[in-house]
Amino acid sequence: MSTLHDADVIVIGAGMAGASVAYFMAPHARVLVLEREEHAGVHSTGRSAALFSETYGSAQVRALTRAARRFFDRPPEGFAGHPILSPRGSVSIGTVDHIEKVHALHAEMAPRTQGLRVVDAAWLQETVPVLRPEAAQIGLYEPGAADIDVNELHQGFLRGLRARGGQLRVNVDIRSIERGPGHWFVDAGGERFRAPLLLNAAGAWVDQVAALADIEPIGIQPRRRSAFLFEAPAGIDTLRWPFVTDVEEGFYFKPDAGLLLGCPANVDPVAPHDVQPEELDIAIGIHRIEEVTTMTIRRPTRTWAGLRSFVADGDLVGGFAPGASDFFWVAAQGGYGIQTSAAMGETCANLALGRPLPGHLQDAGITAEMLDPRRLRA
């Protein structure tokens, strides 16, 4: 006979989405997080490039990111052993053909992004001397962009979950999900878990979890993004370089532990799986970076890939499934789940528990409607 475990809330998935929402729910409910893998955060969280940028993503994403900064800058006592954010800065470069676009982006985002400014070719050459002048005639510089210690943040949420009385179970292979009178029953072979509220934070697998629960899918589309580390050019101090991308988001590179991290910014549709980097992705990334810089990248020291999961409109999803007040989506985090996690987790925790959104989230422009999965039916 299966052992039955009771909780007020079951969260499926212990990546950044599940860990953050569980952390914020734990003071108000008995929370149980179920993770299929041996370790939490394997497929997306642990493979992130880890940049905090208030100019990245849609208006919804930018609002969530701004709201998250307060937590990252001043986390609760004991949450982290060292700062979550480290100064980095970010610059999007463009050619003469991008001058109008850069100024338009600045006009759109400067009112809500402190210090955002347009920089010229001379500034770019002085700051990142490997940039080719013809490729970097103008830039949009965000001084407040920062590196995120993803592991410290993720583990902080998981430590805090446990400290607040919540539980994390790993190596849980869910076989079935059934709705009974007033409860969900999650069967994992020799164990069963029961709770009146189910949160689906299973990343690229959220539609598969929904199918087990007989809930209409949201049309999640996992996309592969590849990255690589390579040696910095000899004789040049790259430690203080900003994160560098182009206004078309065709590549990026940034300092990373004495090396440089590069990426072709690819978004290739794939089925959910333990994704691996494609050689072509890496070659494209190297080519694009070499096109705009004087760097020669001979052989990456490491390559990897991660999954970024989207719905049709590209925005994050957080809300009850239509017609199901006991099944809550925390999904479609795309490439924004790390930098929005504190705000997304707190927002979804309050919405799922029927609590009002705190004032600081409302002040940032966060609403239930902007996350509601019902928008996908329109």
Task: Describe the function of each predicted region.
Residues T3-A7, G323-A378:
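C-terminal lid/capping helical subdomain adjacent to the catalytic/cofactor pocket in oxidative enzymes
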Residues L4-A7, A188-L197:
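Core beta-strand elements of the Rossmann-like FAD/NAD(P) dinucleotide-binding domain
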Residues A7-L32:
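N-terminal Rossmann-like FAD-binding beta1-loop-alpha1 element of flavoenzymes
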Residues A26-T45:
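Glycine-rich FAD pyrophosphate-binding loop
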Residues G41, R192-R240:
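Central helical "cap/lid" subdomain
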Residues A49-T127, G250-F251, R288:
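Dinucleotide-binding Rossmann-like beta1-alpha1 core, especially the glycine-rich loop
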Residues R74, I93-R164, R169-V170, S176-G182, ...:
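Flavin (FAD/FMN) cofactor-binding and adjacent substrate-gating region
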Residues E216-G219, A232-D326, A331:
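Active-site lid/adjacent beta-loop-alpha segment flanking the redox-cofactor pocket in flavoenzymes
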